[in-house]
Amino acid sequence: MCTDLSAAYTRAVSEHLPNAALVVGHFHVTKLMNEKLDLLRRQLWHEEKDINKRKVIKGIRWLLLKNGNDIFDYAHRNRLENALSLNRPLMIAYYLKEDLKEIWNQCSKQKAKDLLDEWVKQVIESKIQLLVKMASTIRAYKTYILAWYDHCITNGKIEGINNKIKVLKRQIYGFRNEEYFTLRLYALHDRHLRI
C-alpha cells in the first residue's frame, strides 16, 4: 500500500492491515522537501537586508522548485546559479533537494539506502534547522521510503483522480443534485478508467 508521510495513515495500515507492505510515495517526500526549500527561501528573504538580494531571492521560487534537470533555458539556469551563489544556505538546500530525488534512481535498494543515509548526514551537517527537522522525519520513514524498491508502487494515479474530483466540485459549486454530481464523476473517469 502506498501512502504519504502521515503518521495516522501508517498507524492505521499497521493496525488494520498488519501484513500489508507499506510504501511512502516519492511524490510526498519530494513535496515535503520542496515545501521546506520554499519556507527557507521565504525566511532568508525576510532576513536579507540588501534590497537587490531580496529581489533575487523572491524571484527564483519556481526555479528552485523545478526539477534541475528540466531547466534547459540558459538564462533561467544562469539566473538560478547567480541566486544560489548569493546565498549559501539556499544553495545547500537546493542541492540537497536535487540529491534527494536521486534515491529513486539507484540500481539497488542497498545503494538507495546508502545514499539516503549520506543525505541525512549532509542535512545534519548543514545545520539548516528546517532541513534537520525534515531529516528526522525521513529517518523515521526510511523503511517505508526504501520499500519502493521491493514493490515499485506509487499513488500518483489516485492523487490525480482526487485532484480531478476537487476540480469538478469547484466547477459544479452550487448544484444541489447529488445524482448529477455522481453522473459527472462517472463521466469524468469513463474516458480513462473504469471505476
Feature names for model-found ranges:
Residues 2-19, 23, 27-31, 49-195:
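Acidic/histidine-rich catalytic cores and adjacent linkers
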Residues 34-45:
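Short, surface-exposed amphipathic charged segments that create phosphate/polyanion-binding patches used
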